[in-house]
Amino acid sequence: MLFDQRGSGQSLPHGETAQNTTQDLIADIEVLRQQLGIEQWLLFGGSWGSTLALAYAIAHPERVSGLILRGIFLGTRAEVDWFLHDMGRFFPEAYDQFVSYLTVEERGDILLSYHEKLMDPQALVHQPAAERWASYETSCSTLRAGMRRVTGR
């Protein structure tokens, strides 16, 4: 069974961030489990979903038979810094596109600058910011190194 968490996918209202905390999402998962009459379940999650699955398992260990996690993201400062700064070394074109949306001043705090744009009520501001963020994340999700780069020949 798959579900879309608050504000994402087919969940309505789309893109809503009010009352959309990790604790709210954990509560939603628990309500869903109860409504489906599932005693214990195996959770699967990737990226943010891995974080959410782990948080749910910590809150409700008796309801989780196991976890299958991929692309694990724990939300640590080091992981966020890697995403915002260091990952660009491996994906320079994607990184350039990502930061080029920001002014030189805004690049001093990429996370804050994107947060402000993503939370802006005006679609002309938040939509392109969301597209740039998603494009960067998607571009960096796979590593396709050419054979020359791998073998050195």
Give the predicted meaning of each segment.
Residues M1-L12:
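Conserved alpha/beta-hydrolase
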Residues S11-H14, Q35, L54, A78:
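Active-site-proximal flexible loops/turns
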Residues H14-L25, A78-D81, H85-D86:
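Catalytic nucleophile-loop/oxyanion-hole region of alpha/beta-hydrolase
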Residues Q23-L42, A59:
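Conserved acidic catalytic loop of the alpha/beta-hydrolase fold
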Residues E39-H85:
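Conserved hydrolase catalytic core segment
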Residues W82, M87-R153:
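Alpha/beta-hydrolase
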